[in-house]
Amino acid sequence: MIRALGSRGFAPVSALLEDVGSMFVLTGKTLVSAIRPPYPYGNEFVSQFLFALRLGWFPMIVTSVALAYGPAGIQAANFLNLFGALDRLGGLFVLAVIREFAPLVCAIVMAGVAGTAMCADLGARKIREELDALMVLGVDPVKNLVVPRFLSLMLVTGLFDIYALIFGTFGGMLVTLVNGAPLSGFFSTYFTNATTTELWGSLVKTTIFGAIIAIVCCYKGMTASGGPEGVGRAVNQAVVIAFLAIGAFNYVFTQALLATHPELSMVR
């Protein structure tokens, strides 16, 4: 009985570890398939790119401005006003928006709108046994279905990071104007702290976020079972796992960036 209870208690952990291992395997297969010719997924890549772009552009803009103006902007401005140093808001926005908010906003939006749609699409195909039919016909599902989604989501997420930086900065400008301060102080400290390393780090991190979302959502979709309810569970699990993976990678990437570039820890 004790052994049964123990195995039942460790079953979720074992299943999670098995999923993580399988996702790493899928990542390797995807990278190899993306590099190795032939490249039959051009039309599917364009279709998935436009699909993700159409779904995510408006939520991304709204979320970027809202988060930059609200939690980052208003709270930071209230704190700096206590010391009469509102001109330092631009430097803090580099730390908040470029390093954290912009990549995370892109990841949250793309996982919530594009990632779930990809998972549901592949899950429905799995339930209808379309994936098995493709393999019977000699068509590789990884090369023809996963690779275009993987590449398109990386590209769209990296592109959205640029827009998130622009609209996040716009939120900081609004906060500065609402507090009656000139924009010259905001831009002075903003451009003093916004180094090339910081910008490239934000872009690389966001692009990898897109890769993580694509792998997790494609894997959960291609392993869905149990009919329509199973597809719903797969979508739910994909979002949760993607957010956990993004949080873990974000911590590791940021710490590695600060360790290799300690000058980024200082607000000038």
Regions found by a protein language model. Name each.
Residues 2-45, 220-225:
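Short, membrane-interfacial amphipathic segments enriched in basic
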Residues 40, 48-105:
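Active-site cofactor/substrate anionic-group-binding motifs, chiefly glycine-
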Residues 53, 57, 61, 101, ...:
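Selective transmembrane-helix segments that form parts of the transport pathway or gating/packing helices
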Residues 66, 106-111, 147-176, 208, ...:
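Hydrophobic alpha-helical transmembrane segments that constitute the membrane-spanning cores
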Residues 74-98, 166-207, 216-235, 257-268:
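Membrane-interfacial helix-loop-helix connectors in multipass membrane proteins
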Residues 89-132, 160, 216:
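Hydrophobic alpha-helical transmembrane segments of multi-pass membrane transport proteins
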Residues 122-147, 228-231:
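Short cytoplasmic-facing helical segments at TM-TM junctions of multi-pass membrane proteins
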Residues 221, 240, 244, 248-262:
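Membrane-helix cytosolic exit motif
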